[in-house]
């Protein structure tokens, strides 16, 4: 069963205009898309996803005249809007970041460290290198950097050395459980969390260019959204949330140079581009009981001035 996390909160905060144009940056299995479509009359929705399974699902189950699915990363939303004369015309954007439940639950996709499958991890299986190939191609230093920065893994160097040594002896790491067991054997089980959690996250982020895609989307998002339009972002780990929070905060409270004489900040309201609608919201107890994966979700919503 796929649950869209913080569904009602995010859709309510978008304040849907029934005649508006909306973007679902991460279609997944269409939970947020369906909720938006239910509130539209003459409005329309454009959804994006890199995952071919998600695209197929949308084409089979979302055959609505006011809905379009685009097989692309959300990093291309600006280019899409530019090509379709939609810059500054979007009423709202929802982004549900990270890996989806169907991706995690399908062992063949290679995201899970508890179910065995090929070590793939690509959200778009039509292009790019697999996680297995990445482990072979990356140096110890690069792999260590990825584990440390993208996974916040304390034992990054130790794990990277063990992986490269294993590959040198065995040729490659082909399956998810092969990698998970190697990590566990390297650092042991020192906490409740599976010891492979952080490295799998880091490798997935690297393979799918997730943080760079997010930065690319946020860099141009003001040009896409109309005045009064809203942006809702749901993140599941601190790296994503930090990027979202910093970008939103920079446009709400822009840093300005201190006046040397008055020692005061100039009141230049033209630099303020957004306002908070929801600074930080988390799943309530009912949702946590229904879907344990919602425990780390953070919703932030802003409105363009």
UniProtKB/Swiss-Prot annotation:
Give the location in the cell.
Cytoplasm
Q: Which UniProt keywords apply?
A: Cytoplasm, Methyltransferase, rRNA processing, S-adenosyl-L-methionine, Transferase
**Residue runs in coiled coils:** none
Is Hydrolase one of the keywords? no
Q: Give EC number(s), comma-separated.
A: 2.1.1.199
Cellular component terms per the entry's GO annotation: cytoplasm
Q: Which domain of life is it from?
A: Bacteria
Q: Which GO terms describe its molecular function?
A: rRNA (cytosine-N4-)-methyltransferase activity
Q: Which Pfam families match?
A: Methyltransf_5
Cytoplasm as a keyword? yes
Q: Enumerate the residues binding S-adenosyl-L-methionine.
A: 30-32, 49, 74, 96, 103
Name the reaction it catalyses. Answer: cytidine(1402) in 16S rRNA + S-adenosyl-L-methionine = N(4)-methylcytidine(1402) in 16S rRNA + S-adenosyl-L-homocysteine + H(+)
A GO BP term here is:
rRNA base methylation
Function, as annotated, reads: Specifically methylates the N4 position of cytidine in position 1402 (C1402) of 16S rRNA.
The family line of this record is: Belongs to the methyltransferase superfamily. RsmH family.
Put simply, this protein is called Ribosomal RNA small subunit methyltransferase H
Q: What is the lineage of its organism?
A: Bacteria, Pseudomonadati, Pseudomonadota, Gammaproteobacteria, Thiotrichales
